[in-house]
Amino acid sequence: MDAIRVDGLVKTFEGFTAVDRISFTVEEGELFGLLGPNGAGKTTTINMLATLLRPTSGSAAVAGFDVTRDRDAVRKSIGVVFQEPALDGRLTGRENLEFHTMMYGIGKAERRRRIDEVLELVELTDKAATPVDKYSGGMKRRLEIARGLTHRPKVLFLDEPTLGLDAQTRRHIWEYVRKLNKEAGVTIILTTHYMEEADFLCDRVAIMDHGTFVALDTPVRLKDTLGGDVISLELEGDAAAFLEELGRLDWIKRSKRHEDVLSLTMEKGERRIPELVMLAQQKGVTVACVNLRKPSLEDVFLHFTGRTIREQEASPGERNRSMMMGHGRR
């Protein structure tokens, strides 16, 4: 059964199309990723599925409920962890969860049991009585995730759950997210602009750019569409003659240039490096750096869009609760 079904979903803001006719399904128990740069339409998509924004056109159902006609039923079926913090730093971790569960009308004894359960799940039991102001960034994100689970949602939306965290803390959050999905069986929709995050966590990934899907499949299959090895050459000098010569070589499957870095896909790349460097020198081009690796989701994004993903900082105050206040009740 599909936990989410989306058909031709569109969202426009004063003539600007943020989401442009996307269609997809997410199976129950799946961990589905929306991958793309900031401004690609990921958060707008999440906000429509979470009933915080009304679609301009198209349809979507979450947990079997239409996001336009059955908004209350959808909201009871989902949990949402926003990019922007939504915790009260003056309260303890447990008090934050108490306040949240009271809003769902859960009885006192059941509240206590569920809170204990989610605190243990995210390994914050020993910090439950500590004010959230004293939590690290990673602990706050774990508590945000715990809060999104206290009412036992069928679907959990995580909007950039590791944004702004260091690499080690991000990896810890990944482990908690995977645990929720595999052990608790929660269907998870994750937005991210971290390629390695989507690759590590997601069963399937939709790559978004300018409001549309440019690719959708498992991370393995997406990378397999490129095949072979990827050689990246950092070039110095006028490379026009070199690039023209490369175009005549039938063993180069595909090439993409981004600024001074040329990415070439081919079989048995390690054997071709000396030939490529020599050819560049013959054409008056200096190769400052050479890198050989297997294709990544970054290469997939570059292949479908012609550019690399941009790690821009999200502007504070946008999306999330401002959208909920400004658009959620329309």
What are these regions (language model features)?
Residues 98, 102, 109-127:
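Conserved ABC ATPase "signature" region
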Residues 156-159:
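Catalytic Walker B motif of ABC-type/P-loop ATPase nucleotide-binding domains
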Residues 171-184:
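Helical segment within the ABC ATPase nucleotide-binding domain
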Residues 227, 231-307:
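Short, charged/small-residue-rich alpha-helical element at the C-terminal edge
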